[in-house]
């Protein structure tokens, strides 16, 4: 998986995923007992550092024989994480680190079976497993809550990275190969195939990724950042198997490795296994992988590039992107990087920032350019600022505005209130608790540590905030001086512009064809024969049953039979039910509310997503939109609104439709947060056309940019559109219909009619009628929270007259959050809408897009959550993915991904992602059904599928999200326990019966959708709708 920016999460984003409350001190106490100089299983302790603000203790070590670096973060968190990363610094764009990342996971000395990595997804209870290729490092992380599982996964990961098989056929499959279009027909044409090859062809259909890649290549042109680490599709076929093996030998050595462990498991256990299984077998080398500093320019530079046309652009004439980019400080200077990240946020984040005012509100473009802000995932950090969605002729104007704004910031500085708001945001982010803190931590420190920076110093956020405040106190122009140093006088700046070319993809295709012709012409007859024979050998290998008995595995008996219960209390504030969930929230309060859409006229429904996206951004009460944003930043951790469409747990034709309001704050700020919600509910502003225009254009741009990354999601939403009433609403609210509607609105010259529609929606949903709320907070906060909820709910508007539901069939459903037999004062009632006349129908849709790969979704209507067969279908989806679809779609077909899944609303879906095939993949979906019906899987396969499903069922839940299954879905602990028992009870025959009953062609109604290039066969088939 190529992830160039994943490792460089900006500071604010990374910190947002912090910290579990310190329930106990055992893990940290154990870590504090270590002493610098102490030897443990071949490692020497270098440093032990408590970081109380994050409730952790950091232990830094080094391996005696190899020099491998090691950081252990002890914390009372059961979701333990391991990661090993290597500094990988390619000097060409063949994608060697990316293809190597894939290929090492295809078998190793201890585990020589094919694809042990994917097989372990079904033999463990992991909460995360993946691998990432960044610009200058490759990382292999996993996490799990089970100690035995941790040891199993660690064994597989260590053997994979240090002792991989690196077989030639695996290189062919994962990287690239020349192969006959039909491998069994030597007369069919030779073409390029390969998983990474197709993945990167798909990646480069994303114009934002293209822009970001060129930005880095051109701003840092002297070394590894000048190439595409993931692989340029036209360069990938230049990589040889021998070069791959050589790259592994020089880069995947312990002397070039950094190990990271996190959680409450004993450090000694990790060190012993890592030393004995891997590091003891190596000596020390000089890996020579360091990245030299970029030579600084004496004058600015400018570049122009081209890209494909965006068919969803709100204005076809405005598709140019332009940015000005500045090379900044070394990433290893952690306080300077911290300061520059804060300065960046102050310059670009939110409607009160200088660049937002100067660029976004200048009516020149639709949104900031890709990578806008502070970027800290290369040896030297950089800042980027610009616009997308502009006229090509306006590029110089944008450059002038940027220079002018920099001068204004240097002259006028930043308002103190905005600095306080940003520091308040940091305080919230340090208190907010995440279930994946270990993973976030690993990614946060990765880039700095990769270049010999101090990862422990990065964790001392409290110290940096104190030092930052002191710098401002001693020098009120501290930030202005930074602006002058890094932006006004910095000559290492680069302007990059990118404009669409209608022939772009045709030219790419022509270049690929020329590359292919060149390769084919150079082949001898013997080489052609070998290609045909190797193609047959690869198919044979991919089709041959594998023996995975060498791989470690948990057993179903290792799964906890009972779920932990969550205590919930339902109380009423007036007529509104409020769910209270007492949790150790570390000084935070979490608020949610659901307001019904049952009385909203049908003609207003398409505008609900737009209403949700803008209602907290238009101003309210005494605040204009800038003042509202400032108050939100000063008193909350964010306020969000989104559509809420949930199928009933017992009927696919019954559902809840509403709007979900969410926010969080420090406990001391709850009165201010609820006051803001009161102002939004009682006095929202719908009178600023220009503000709405800005927000709509940004939304349209964001949706358009998201299609290449989420094409399979859009295809699946479309495919399920005609299968259930909720499917129809999902397409309306979050599918391609919504994308096209927002595009149309963004093109409108007059926003008055839209504002009037939004104002009408407000009259139906910003009311206390048909509302329910929830609060998650610490025990000592509940009394205050209850009073604030009472004050809020009695202060917002109620309907002056009772409104009837637009759809006549309303079902009132009470939900009891506690197990039967327990006492509870009251229950909450949800008003669901039933559609007893709904008839599912088949529909096939092809969205013709200028992509070289396909995104495919095929869906089948099955049963709701509480149906006895739901558990069988859930297991079935997993077993079909792991035992059939993965091999057919990814290994044989060359798609980046594919599989089957069962949604909560009873839709059984097949999908593929960045797929070079289309109709043949649909045939594979049918073959998967035939395979499942015939029962060609073992009891071991069933048990593995159960493990995989339970890893999702039992994934950690943060205190902020406890009780949300009940509040949002009406699912009680008792219902979850019943479903759990049904999962345990699923048998081999249950799976074949479910396949026959629900997936058999002719007995089920299917919906199908493809997003991808034109297809002659589909165009000739009248059963397809072409869009």
Curated annotation (Swiss-Prot):
Entry-linked SUPFAM superfamilies: LuxS/MPP-like metallohydrolase (SSF63411)
Annotated active site: 101 (proton acceptor)
MF term (GO), any: metal ion binding
Enzyme class: hydrolase
Pfam families: M16C_assoc, Peptidase_M16, Peptidase_M16_C, PreP_C
Regulation: Mainly exists in a closed and catalytically competent conformation but a closed-to-open switch allows substrate entry into the catalytic chamber. Substrate binding induces closure and dimerization. A disulfide bond may lock the enzyme in a closed conformation preventing substrate entry into the catalytic chamber, participating in redox regulation of the enzyme. Inhibited by metal-chelating agents. Inhibited by nickel and zinc excess, and slightly activated by manganese.
Disulfide bonds: 113-550
Transit peptide start-stop: 1-22
Low complexity compositional bias, start-end: 814-825
Required co-factors: Zn(2+)
Renumbered residue ranges of the record's region Disordered: 803-827
Binding site for Zn(2+): 98, 102, 199
Gene Ontology CC terms, in alphabetical order: mitochondrial matrix
Keywords, ordered alphabetically: Disulfide bond, Hydrolase, Metal-binding, Metalloprotease, Mitochondrion, Protease, Transit peptide, Zinc
Subcellular location(s) of the protein: Mitochondrion matrix
EC number(s) from the headed UniProt entry: 3.4.24.-
Mod. after translation: A disulfide bond locks the enzyme in the closed conformation preventing substrate entry into the catalytic chamber.
Gene Ontology terms: biological process: protein processing; proteolysis
Primary localisation category: mitochondrion
Subunit record text: Monomer and homodimer; homodimerization is induced by binding of the substrate.
Family designation: Belongs to the peptidase M16 family. PreP subfamily.
The protein's role, per its UniProt record: Metalloendopeptidase of the mitochondrial matrix that functions in peptide cleavage and degradation rather than in protein processing. Has an ATP-independent activity. Specifically cleaves peptides in the range of 5 to 65 residues. Shows a preference for cleavage after small polar residues and before basic residues, but without any positional preference. Degrades the transit peptides of mitochondrial proteins after their cleavage. Also degrades other unstructured peptides.
Name of the molecule in the record: Presequence protease, mitochondrial
Biological source species: Xenopus laevis
């Amino acid at each position: 998986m190529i992830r160039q920016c994943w490792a460089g999460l900006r500071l604010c984003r990374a910190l947002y995923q912090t910290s579990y409350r310190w329930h106990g001190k055992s893990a940290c106490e154990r870590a504090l007992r270590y002493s610098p100089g102490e030897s443990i299983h071949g490692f020497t302790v270098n440093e032990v550092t408590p970081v109380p603000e994050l409730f952790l203790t950091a232990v830094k070590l080094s391996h005696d024989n190899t020099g491998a670096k090691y950081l252990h973060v002890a914390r009372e968190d059961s979701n333990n994480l391991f990661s090993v990363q290597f500094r990988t610094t390619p000097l060409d764009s063949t994608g060697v680190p990316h293809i190597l990342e894939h290929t090492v996971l295809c078998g190793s000395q201890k585990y020589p079976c094919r694809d042990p990595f994917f097989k372990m997804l079904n033999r463990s209870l992991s909460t995360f497993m993946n691998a990432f290729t960044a610009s200058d490092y490759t990382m292999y992380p996993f996490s799990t809550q089970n100690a035995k599982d941790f040891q199993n996964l660690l064994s597989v990961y260590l053997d994979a990275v240090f002792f991989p098989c690196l077989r030639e056929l695996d290189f062919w499959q994962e990287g690239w190969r020349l192969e006959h279009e039909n491998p069994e027909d030597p007369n069919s044409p030779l073409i390029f195939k390969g998983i990474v090859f197709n993945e990167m062809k798909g990646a480069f259909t994303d114009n934002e990724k293209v822009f970001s890649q060129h930005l880095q290549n051109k701003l840092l042109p002297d070394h590894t950042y000048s190439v595409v680490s993931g692989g340029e599709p036209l360069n990938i076929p230049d990589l040889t198997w021998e070069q791959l093996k050589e790259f592994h030998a020089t880069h995947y050595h312990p002397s070039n490795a950094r190990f990271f462990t996190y959680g409450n498991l004993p450090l000694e256990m990790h060190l012993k296994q890592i030393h004995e299984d891997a590091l003891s077998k190596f000596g020390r080398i000089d890996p020579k992988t360091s990245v030299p500093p970029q030579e600084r320019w004496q004058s600015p530079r400018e570049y122009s590039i081209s890209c494909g046309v965006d068919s969803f652009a709100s204005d076809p004439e405005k598709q140019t992107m332009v940015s000005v980019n500045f090379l900044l400080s070394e990433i290893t200077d952690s306080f300077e990087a911290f300061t520059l990240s804060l300065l960046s946020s102050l310059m670009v984040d939110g409607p009160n920032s200088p660049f937002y005012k100067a660029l976004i509100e200048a009516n020149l473009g639709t949104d900031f350019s890709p990578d806008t802000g502070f970027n800290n995932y290369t040896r030297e950090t950089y800042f980027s600022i610009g616009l997308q969605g502009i006229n090509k002729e306006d590029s110089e104007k944008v450059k002038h505005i940027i220079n002018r704004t920099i001068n204004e910031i240097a002259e006028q500085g930043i308002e103190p209130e905005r600095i306080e708001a940003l520091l308040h945001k940091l305080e919230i982010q340090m208190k907010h608790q995440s279930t994946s803190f270990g993973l976030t931590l690993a990614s946060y420190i990765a880039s700095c540590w990769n270049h010999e920076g101090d990862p422990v110093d990065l964790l001392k956020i409290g110290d940096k905030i104190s030092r930052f405040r002191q710098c401002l106190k001693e020098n009120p122009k501290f930030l202005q001086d930074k602006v002058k140093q890094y932006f006004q006088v910095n000559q290492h700046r680069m302007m990059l512009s990118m404009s669409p070319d209608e022939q772009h993809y045709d030219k790419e295709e022509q270049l690929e064809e020329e590359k292919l012709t060149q390769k084919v012409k150079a082949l001898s007859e013997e080489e052609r024969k070998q290609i045909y024979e190797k193609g047959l050998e690869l198919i044979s290998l991919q089709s041959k049953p594998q023996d995975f008995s060498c791989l470690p595995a948990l057993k179903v008996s290792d799964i906890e039979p009972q779920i932990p219960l969550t205590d919930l209390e339902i109380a009423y504030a007036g007529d509104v039910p409020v769910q209270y969930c007492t949790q150790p929230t570390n000084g935070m309060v979490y608020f949610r509310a659901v307001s019904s859409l049952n009385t909203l006229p049908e003609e207003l429904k398409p505008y609900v997503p737009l209403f949700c996206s803008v209602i907290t951004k238009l101003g309210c009460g005494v605040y204009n939109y800038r003042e509202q944003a400032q108050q939100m930043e000063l008193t909350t951790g964010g306020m969000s609104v989104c559509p809420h469409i949930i199928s009933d747990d017992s009927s696919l034709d019954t559902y809840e439709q509403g709007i979900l309001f969410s926010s969080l704050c420090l406990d001391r700020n709850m009165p201010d947060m609820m006051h803001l919600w009161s102002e939004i509910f009682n006095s929202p502003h719908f009178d600023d056309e220009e503000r709405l225009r800005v927000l709509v254009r940004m939304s349209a741009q964001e949706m358009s940019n998201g299609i290449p990354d989420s094409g399979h999601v859009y295809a699946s939403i479309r495919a399920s559109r005609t299968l259930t009433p909720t499917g129809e609403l999902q397409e309306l609210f979050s599918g391609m219909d919504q994308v096209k509607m927002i595009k149309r609105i963004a093109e409108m010259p007059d926003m008055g009619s839209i504002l009037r529609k939004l104002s009408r929606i407000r009259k139906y949903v910003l009311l206390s009628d048909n509302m329910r709320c929830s609060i998650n907070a610490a025990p000592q906060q509940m009394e205050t929270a209850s009073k604030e909820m009472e004050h809020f709910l009695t202060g917002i508007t109620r309907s002056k007259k009772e409104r009837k539901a637009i759809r006549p069939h309303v079902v009132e459903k009470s939900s009891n959050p506690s197990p039967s037999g327990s006492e509870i004062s009251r229950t909450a009632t949800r008003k669901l809408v039933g559609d007893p006349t709904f008839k599912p129908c088949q529909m096939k849709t092809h969205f013709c897009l200028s992509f070289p790969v396909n995104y495919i979704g095929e869906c089948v209507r099955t049963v709701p959550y509480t149906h006895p067969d739901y558990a069988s279908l859930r297991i079935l989806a997993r077993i079909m993915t792991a035992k059939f679809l993965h091999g057919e779609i990814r290994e044989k077909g060359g798609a980046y991904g594919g599989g089957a899944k069962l949604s909560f609303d009873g839709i059984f879906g097949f999908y593929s992602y960045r797929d070079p095939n289309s109709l043949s993949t649909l045939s594979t979906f049918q073959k998967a059904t035939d395979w499942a019906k015939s029962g060609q899987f073992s009891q071991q396969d069933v048990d593995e599928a159960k493990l995989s499903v339970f890893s999702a069922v039992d994934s950690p839940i943060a205190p902020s999200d406890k009780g949300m299954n009940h509040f949002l879905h009406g699912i009680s602990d008792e219902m979850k326990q019943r479903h759990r028992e049904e999962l345990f009870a699923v048998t081999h025959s249950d799976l074949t019966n479910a396949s026959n009953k629900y997936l058999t062609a002719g007995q089920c109604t299917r919906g199908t959708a493809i997003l991808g290039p034109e297809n002659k066969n589909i165009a000739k088939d009248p059963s397809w709708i072409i869009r």
